[in-house]
Amino acid sequence: MFVDQVKVYVKGGDGGNGAVSFRREKYVPLGGPAGGDGGQGGDVVFVVDEGLRTLVDFRYQRHFKAPRGEHGRNKSQHGAGAEDMVVRVPPGTTVIDDDTKEVIADLVEQGQRAVIAKGGRGGRGNNRFANSSNPAPHISENGEPGQERYIVMELKLIADVGLVGYPSVGKSTLLSSVTAAKPKIAAYHFTTLTPNLGVVDLGERSFVMADLPGLIEGAHEGVGLGHQFLRHVERTRLIVHVIDMAAVDGRDPYEDYLQINRELTLYNLKLEDRPQIVVANKMELPEAEENLRIFKEKAPDVKVYEISAATSKGVQELMYAIGDTLATIPDKPAVEEVAEVEERVVFRAEKEPDAFEITRDNEVFVVSGEKIEKLVRMTNLNSYDAAQRFARQMRSMGVDDALRKLGAKDGDTVRIGKLEFDFVE
């Protein structure tokens, strides 16, 4: 089964909790705080594996959660950081944030890595909070929650040559005649519903050819599963445009040529500049010669290779022409990269989160914001000292003043995430 797009959930591991502990050895007078820090949570890391060819495994496992860090211990022992969760993906995988639609990573080379969800940092133990005014604090932090999000994974096949054209123009027949690939071939449209790959061996050189499902008018807008098919064209170095010059289905070959190129350009403007070889197929049929003459009159500057994929006439010459053209093209097509391929691990800079905002939910004041909600999750509210520290942090952030301006009075309910408490003047 060929699967080229899936939606999955990823979550970095939570950081370990910091510890509250004090030294009590016999010969260590006034030993002081000795609670260790929690360990770093594991990252979810995607790594390219050339042995994979499809995203089918992700249809059955759609949740990836990295392990959390160890908790801090006594005697200032820090918890161990968790191991990363390594997920292997096929080359050509693009990872997109489902919320923002931002491209997180573009994974193309064997061994290339990208951090998709970062693990949370470990919480600090009480020895981190000791100072001259509070030499024996009973304060520690919970571990920071790991980053979590839904992502869309898209697989764009990496092939040297992509065969494009209307349905039933002979692309699959051509691929099967020059490679060991066995695509389904039948006398009806959309016989090919998934891309087929084959290797063309020319002796001293070879290249990978992809038979892409047929395109129709409106493909750039998704008509006829156009988006699913067109994404695979983006990574090909050379486009081989196959035309049914015999017009078996009654279409005009020249209009077919214009329409397919229009769809490619509308889907991705960069495809307009991608090298292209035009192939007139089905030349064994009687109508083909006259149609080819008319085509050349309308497009005199377009070099056309005449073949019959069914009888193999002209096919060998076409393959050598493709090989010669590939020799003049860079190994990688011009695609929009998220990061340089040489960069083995990709981290994306995070913008500073908004501090907070306050809304009303009936009689409840709801304080929300990434920064304030993270502060709640990392505060050990079972500790009186930690709760007092949290109250001071809220005041310093301006939450108390903002609540008063909105009319909060003593005893009103305030909610931050899952925490509810009474407002105190």
UniProtKB/Swiss-Prot annotation:
Biological process terms in GO annotation: ribosome biogenesis
Keyword entries, A-Z: ATP-binding, Cytoplasm, GTP-binding, Hydrolase, Magnesium, Metal-binding, Nucleotide-binding
Residues of the Obg domain: 1-158
Principal location listed in the UniProt entry: cytoplasm
Cofactor: Mg(2+)
Chain spans, region Disordered: 118-144
One GO CC annotation: cytoplasm
UniProt xrefs under Pfam families: DUF1967 (PF09269), GTP1_OBG (PF01018), MMR_HSR1 (PF01926)
Task of the protein: An essential GTPase which binds GTP, GDP and possibly (p)ppGpp with moderate affinity, with high nucleotide exchange rates and a fairly low GTP hydrolysis rate. Plays a role in control of the cell cycle, stress response, ribosome biogenesis and in those bacteria that undergo differentiation, in morphogenesis control.
UniProt protein name: GTPase Obg
